[in-house]
Every structure is written in structure tokens, then in C-alpha cells.
């Protein structure tokens, strides 16, 4: 990444912030309306790896999130921008109930449920980036913005319904933006490919509750405005089932099928071959494009 580009992005992020707060009210009606309180909140964090629930201050939790979501050698400005997005996401997520119903906690350490959390990877620069933006969040209409972010857009970002299969009304602050060629993103996120045997697919999909017997076919049935996969039909010896693109990607391991912005998607001779570009859901901040 270029330090100049990161400074510009951070500047744009700061311009978007319409309120600077330290705390949030997490219960009652209109709980995600921005409020300024007197003390830093304490979060309850469900540790998916061990099943325990830990308490920690918001800013300490965010340092672990930034460490889990970014590389350890990026400039402080990049960590600062990421901290604002992560803080905004956390504020909004917890205000809407977090994972209370599932774990009895505010957040979890699952990247699929909330955000990555890797405290052992925290560096001094990461702590600086979090501290220099302490309490800063993005808001829209005096409410916390769900600060979505992903690793690399593949050249174009998506809106929430397309990239995440977001079930609520499309947020007005998410936009699809076409971006210039990226000279900083590594090749493994700019162009990737993966293969799955029919047996692998059967096991992976069954773990997600998709049971159609032996896999006989997988096909894209719908793409969104940015050409990301939005719907997939899985065919098997015991029937067929439709899945959303984001749901399918999570089922087959989102570190292998890096995005739903695919160029090739073909099932032949018992093997599904996929190639594409980008890493992540494509909504919000694209870290490598920053």
C-alpha cells in the first residue's frame, strides 16, 4: 500500500464521521442512535475457540480485531482507518443485540459472525492506530453505520444485498464503486482458483444443512449488478437446493473461494472449478484498495 493513498482514505473516512463518541447505549428503543456517555464500555466476548466468555474494554477488543483483519507491517494510517470501521461495526452490531441470543455475549471471535480477533498479533503500531482514533465512529442520520470491510474488492465494491445477502433494507450509505487497477494487492487476491471434488462438496454442504445426496451439478442461477454470484443451484441424486452466493462461499471455505466475483464456475467430471478475483464480500472498505 502507498502511504499517500492511505492518508487520503483516512481523510475521507474522517470526513464521513458526523459524531465522535466514547460510548453507546446498548439497550432499549432506538439503541443505535449515537449517544455520548462518560465511560468506555466493557464488552462480553465469546471465544469460539474455547467456549468461554471474556470481558474486555472496547478499545482493547478493537486492537485484537485490527490485528486479525490486517497485516502486521502496514502503516499506522491504515490501522487507524480500519479501527474506525471496526468500531462503527461493533457499535452497531452490539446495539442490535450482538450474539446475546446465541452465546449470551456481545460479540464473538468468529469472522463469520462478527469480526476476526487475533490478540496475539497486536503490534505497537496497531495500538497506536486504535488509540489515535479512540471513540471515533461513522454515522448516518445520527445512527451508527455498519462498518463493513473486506480485503480486496476485485476492482469494484458491492452493495450489502449483493455482497452479503443482507436481509434488511439496503443501507443508504453502501455504494458500488469501480476502482482503478491496484498495483499493491498481491496476486493471490487479484486472481485465484480452486477445485472441489463432488465428494468434498457433499461433505462441506452437508455441514451447512444442504443434503441433496451425491453432487451431480452446481450452477450459477443469478448474478448481481457487479457480476457477483447471488444465487446458486446445487443438484444431487436426492434432489436440488438453491443457495445464495455468500452462503455457498462460506460453506465451501471462504479462504479458498475468496469471493463471489468469479470468472469461471464449471462442474464437469465430478469436479467444480472456480476462478475469480477479490477477497471477501466486497462491501464497504476495501483494505488493499485503501
Each model region followed by its residue ranges:
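Soluble non-cytosolic domains of exported or imported proteins
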Residues: 53-56, 73-84, 195-196, 280-284
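Post-signal peptide N-terminal segment of secreted/secretory-pathway proteins
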Residues: 70-103
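N-terminal Sec-pathway targeting helices
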Residues: 1-16, 24
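Active-site beta-strand/loop microenvironment that shapes enzyme catalytic pockets
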Residues: 272-290
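Acidic/histidine-rich, surface-exposed loop or edge segments in extracytoplasmic proteins
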Residues: 57-75, 107-109, 179-188
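Extended substrate/cofactor- or partner-recognition/assembly subdomains adjacent to catalytic sites
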Residues: 92-272
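Solvent-exposed, polar/charged alpha-helical surfaces in well-ordered, non-transmembrane soluble domains
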Residues: 60, 64, 77, 81-84, ...
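N-terminal, intrinsically disordered, polar/charged segments of Gram-positive cell-envelope systems
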Residues: 26-57
